[in-house]
Amino acid sequence: MSWQTYVDDHLMCELEGNPGHHLSAAAILGQDGSVWAQSSAFPQFKPEEINGITTDFNEPGHLAPTGLHLGGAKYMVIAGEPGAVIRGKKGAGGITIKKTGQALVFGLYEEPVTPGQCNMVVERLGDYLLEQGL
């Protein structure tokens, strides 16, 4: 299965119990910031934005004072799982990032999708990739 298939079928899929609702954007990146696959609406990001995210996984709390930036948008960092999941909020939407052994799995959402729905979609794929040694 290609990485694009994981994005299209497992991240950008219709949400269970919510016909017509799905994440607004998603991607799978290598921990070096290389794009493995992304949805068409995933924001153009800067290398330093990914560096900040990877630093926060290694040093939890790094992004809290400045916020998480992706594609020029600033997200307020909210409770995540140190070293495993970063969650951010921006207005009526937000972001969930799950770290696996080799990748970063991104999901972005806007209302009516809830933070919990985004977390479930992103973390389920991230957990699967971890189980596969990826």
Swiss-Prot record:
Protein name: Profilin-2
Subcellular location as annotated: Cytoplasm, Cytoskeleton
Assembly and interaction partners: Occurs in many kinds of cells as a complex with monomeric actin in a 1:1 ratio.
Organism: Olea europaea (Common olive)
Other noteworthy facts: The variability of the residues taking part of IgE-binding epitopes might be responsible of the difference in cross-reactivity among olive pollen cultivars, and between distantly related pollen species, leading to a variable range of allergy reactions among atopic patients.
Family membership noted in the UniProt record: Belongs to the profilin family.
Post-translational modification: Phosphorylated by MAP kinases.
Role: Binds to actin and affects the structure of the cytoskeleton. At high concentrations, profilin prevents the polymerization of actin, whereas it enhances it at low concentrations.
Gene Ontology cellular-component annotations: cell cortex; cytoskeleton
Record Pfam families: Profilin (PF00235)
SMART domains per UniProt: PROF (SM00392)
Record keywords: Actin-binding, Allergen, Cytoplasm, Cytoskeleton, Disulfide bond, Phosphoprotein
Phosphothreonine carried by residues: T114
Origin superkingdom: Eukaryota
Positions occupied by motif Involved in PIP2 interaction: 84-100
GO molecular function ontology, one term from the record: actin monomer binding
Keyword Cell division: no
Keyword Phosphoprotein among UniProt keywords: yes
